[in-house]
């Protein structure tokens, strides 16, 4: 059974302590230039991890990813004239 996972972006003051982020979830990406890390963890533990991370001295701020809540399947609503134009060529 798969668990639902959600990402969070952790903005850091310095990258020296970036290894300490491993205990909060899977570290997916660390940007050296912009000083942030993307971490994935279980959705059930997200709030607890965000509270712990924001209390650490080397963390500027923590933002959750909203990707699980965004609708990824779109419906196309074409009017009859455009639908006819698309079918003419075939």
Curated annotation (Swiss-Prot):
Cellular component annotations (GO), alphabetically ordered: cytoplasm
Localization (cell): Cytoplasm
Keywords: Cytoplasm
UniProt cross-references to Pfam families, sorted A to Z: DUF2129 (PF09902)
Similarity comment text for this entry: Belongs to the UPF0298 family.
Protein name: UPF0298 protein BPUM_1393
Record organism: Bacillus pumilus (strain SAFR-032)
